[in-house]
């Protein structure tokens, strides 16, 4: 397995559904998905189980501890060579993983990152803050 997507979730089953649907549309399929429920009152188990029939999805629950520990929980259980951590409100374009894979083959590295795409409704200030907080390292 080359890629492991870690998705920490807290009370966001609808967002998790949209993200899992975007992962299910990826053209490159060498990945697993770990959904880590962080003490949610609105669990997304049913959503995860629906997508587990379409792609490798593992679902975990744990007591609420915040995003950092929840990400680490997923990373500790990941089987991929690369770990990609996504917030539950992310939606990936269809060719995202294929583009990442092509770039990593052309220029191998141990870690990578980059900016999010700002939502169309963001003000210029929100776009600037979003870019500053998610820029390449």
Name each model feature, range by range.
Residues 1-4, 24-35, 54-58:
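Short loop->beta transition adjacent to catalytic acidic/histidine clusters or analogous donor-positioning motifs
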Residues 12-15, 40, 67:
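Donor nucleotide-sugar binding loop of glycosyltransferases
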Residues 19, 44-45, 71, 95-97, ...:
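Acidic donor-diphosphate engagement hotspot in glycosyltransferases and nucleotidyltransferases
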Residues 44, 62-78, 99:
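Glycine-rich, basic loop-to-helix element that forms the pyrophosphate-binding segment
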Residues 83:
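Short aromatic/hydrophobic "clamp" motif used to bind/position activated sugar donors
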Residues 95-127, 131:
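Conserved donor NDP-sugar-binding/catalytic core segment of glycosyltransferases
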């Amino acid at each position: 397995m080359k890629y492991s997507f870690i998705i920490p979730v807290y009370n966001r089953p609808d967002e998790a559904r949209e993200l899992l649907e975007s992962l299910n549309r990826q053209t490159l399929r060498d990945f697993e998905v770990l959904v880590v429920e962080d003490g949610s009152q609105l669990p997304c188990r049913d959503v995860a189980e629906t997508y587990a029939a379409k792609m490798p999805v593992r679902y975990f629950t744990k007591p609420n501890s915040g995003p950092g520990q929840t990400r680490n929980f997923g990373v500790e259980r990941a089987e991929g060579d690369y770990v990609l951590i996504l917030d539950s409100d992310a939606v990936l374009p269809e060719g995202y993983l294929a583009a990442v894979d092509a770039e990593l083959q052309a220029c191998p590295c141990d870690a990578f990152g980059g900016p999010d795409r700002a939502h169309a409704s963001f003000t210029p200030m929100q776009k600037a803050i979003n870019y500053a907080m998610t820029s390449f390292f």
